[in-house]
Amino acid sequence: MWLLNIHVLQLFLFILIFDPFVREDIDYMEPTLNTPILLYTEQTPNPESLKFVTNKMLYRGTADFRESSFAKDWSPLATALFGFPYVKGVYICNNFVTITKELNFTWEDIMIRLKEFIKKYVDEAGEILKPGFEEEKARVEAEKGIGYQYSGDEEETVNKIKNLIDSYVKPAVEMDGGNIEFKSYDHGIVTVILEGSCSGCPSSTVTLKAGIEGMLKRMIPEVKEVISEMG
């Protein structure tokens, strides 16, 4: 319950402070040859997901791997992590990796081994993502209907929705080791995609309805409902 409250509170803090908000790309300090790689963990609202944070930029973007077969094609790091029997999902963003574990394992038993592995992998400059991943990600998103070109009043509404999600929701969700992406808008229904720790999180429905849907309906009268799909 405490984690759920923190998750919702973080989102409302971004919503209530409604001044113009421009999200700058975070500039992480790139370790030099003499700078040790640091790594620590952060809890997420999803008890099955844990955030592993390092002081090195891993990937300026988002990469969500729910299947080892997709990871094998595009991410050596995710592929290596899927080699552990307790890893169910891998999400890479900026300077952190969110790992979702299988239900029959506890973090107490596996966390230290994962920390040591990720730290060693990053320290040895292991490849995170293969060239061409961005293009493949765009192709997959196009198949899901993401990137559909709206026109007229719908285009204006969709732009407002995207701006609110990118400016107020994404930063809060990212702090919890997850991600949210706009997918579609149809007759007042907004569909978003949840990734990382948000996928399968027990509190995601509360956050979606009490936070995201409430904000969009309040700021954009055309919005009637927000629904989600898992990444």
Identify the residue ranges that each predicted region occupies.
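Domain-level signature for proteins that mediate thiol-based redox and metal-cofactor handling
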Residues: 7, 14, 21, 25-231
